[in-house]
Regions:
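Compact alpha-helical subdomains of small soluble proteins
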Residues: 62-119
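Intrinsically disordered, low-complexity segments enriched in polar/charged small residues
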Residues: 7-8, 41-42, 86
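Immediate post-signal-peptide N-terminus of mature secreted/exported proteins
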Residues: 18-60, 112-119
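Residues in and immediately flanking transmembrane alpha helices
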Residues: 15-16, 85
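Sec-dependent N-terminal signal peptides
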Residues: 4-13
Length: 119
């Protein structure tokens, strides 16, 4: 996921303002990813290792973490459209949701019946 979002950047801008903004965007995405990894790992560490799936409340808690991640990624992309590669300037929230849902982590969690209704 991180590689895809970082790939959204325009690498060819020469202006200092544009370069600074692009760098800020990269830092923002890196921070969002770090926060998500920390929150999701904390949640997963709190689970009983013997359980076969998430309870309804656990599913709701985890999906809230994922929804926050999607919201923050989309907000970062939306606020920095001018610094994204032309092919990614029209990325929508559904595109971000599809990328997150197709991530390796989310695919692994499907076997535990984790299915988040992301919006």
């Amino acid at each position: 996921m991180k590689k895809i979002l970082l790939g959204l950047l325009i690498l060819g801008y020469g202006g200092n303002v544009l370069a600074a903004s692009a760098a800020e965007y990269v830092q923002s995405v890196e921070q969002i990813n770090a926060d998500y990894q920390k929150e999701s790992r904390q949640f997963l560490k709190g689970l009983n290792p013997q359980q076969q799936g998430f309870s309804a409340s656990q599913n709701q808690q985890f999906c809230a973490i994922v929804q926050c991640y999607v919201d923050r990624l989309y907000k970062a992309a939306d606020q920095n459209r001018a610094y994204l590669d032309r092919q990614y300037q029209n990325v929508g929230k559904q595109d971000v949701i599809l990328q997150v849902k197709s991530s390796k982590e989310m695919q692994l969690l499907k076997r535990y019946n984790v299915d988040c209704n992301l919006q």
